[in-house]
Amino acid sequence: MRVSIICAVVLAAVPLVASAQNQNAGRNLAASCAMCHGTDGRGATGYQPLAGMAKDELVRKLDGFRSGATPATVMHQISKGYTDQEIQLIAGYFSAQKK
């Protein structure tokens, strides 16, 4: 009985740890965006704010930059450096930030 309870508690905590790790990974990846978009994604003057943007919308934009379908200056080069999973993490981080 005790072992079952301990196992249940440990297994219940696993998603929380994974979620925290993803959030930290997203924040770490998003740090490279800070120069133009700010550390919190609110955007430096003249740059689009990313904070609070829908995750799917941001993923589409980054994919468009990466493929060259969306016009940009430096975002083509920057976005090509990220995997699909990293783009998901970055988009998740910025979508969770307050506008």
Task: For the regions a language model picked out, list residue spans one by one.
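Residue-level hotspots at or immediately adjacent to binding/recognition sites across diverse folds
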Residues: 20-21, 39, 78, 93-95
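The canonical Cys-X-X-Cys-His
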Residues: 33-39, 90
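Gly/Gly-Pro-rich "capping" loops immediately C-terminal to redox-active cysteine motifs
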Residues: 40-70, 76-80
